[in-house]
Amino acid sequence: MNRIVLAGLLLILALPAAAGPDAPGCFTRTYDRAHLAQHPDQVVTAVTLRIYRPPPANADKYWFLAQFRLRGKDKPLRTSGICNETASGLRCLVECDGGGVDVVPRARDATMHLDRISGPACDEDSAQELTGGKDDRLFRLDRVNDAACAGMKR
C-alpha cells in the first residue's frame, strides 16, 4: 500500500505544474538574420516578456508586460495585462479585447503561443495589433536575468 501511495505521489510531482514557482521572471528572444531569412513570413524580430506578481491586493493573479519588435516598424508593440493560471500554464489577456497569449513558463525557458494581441488602447483607434501568422504563432523564449526587463513599463 505504501508503495502505491509513494508511486502516485511521484507521478503527481513529475507532472508539470500549472504556473508554479517558475512563472515569474523575464523571458526574451531576438531572432538573427539567418533565422529570419529561413522564415520570411515571420514578422516578429524580437520578443521580451515579463511575468510578475502584482501588489499583495491582487496576489492571486500574475501580471505581464510584453514587447514585440516587428519587421518594418520603428516602434515596438508594447502591451500588458493579467494572467490566469490554466492546466498547462498561463493565459495572459490584454484589457478591452486586446487578445492575449498562452505561456508555459519553465525553469530555463518559456513557450508562448500567440493568436492575436494588441497594445492597450481601450479608447484609441490607433492601437497596433499583431496576429499570429504562419511563422508568428509559437515562440520559444529564454529565461534571462530580471534586469533585462527592468525598463519595461505598464
Residue ranges and their predicted role:
Residues D32, A59-R116:
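Contiguous, well-ordered beta-strand patches that form the walls/edges
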Residues P21-A59:
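Short, solvent-exposed loop/hinge segments that bridge or flank secondary-structure elements
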Residues P21-D22, V47-I51, R78, A87, ...:
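Disulfide-bonded cysteine motifs in exported proteins
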Residues N2-G8:
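Sec-dependent signal peptide recognition
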Residues A14-A17:
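N-terminal signal peptide c-region/cleavage motif recognized by signal peptidases
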Residues G25-F27, I82-N84, R91-D97, A121-D123, ...:
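Sequence contexts marking disulfide-bonded cysteines in secreted/extracellular proteins
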Residues R106-R154:
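Glycine-rich, aromatic-bearing surface loops/beta-hairpins
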Residues H35-P40, D74-R78, E124-L130:
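Acidic Ser/Thr/Pro-rich low-complexity disordered segments
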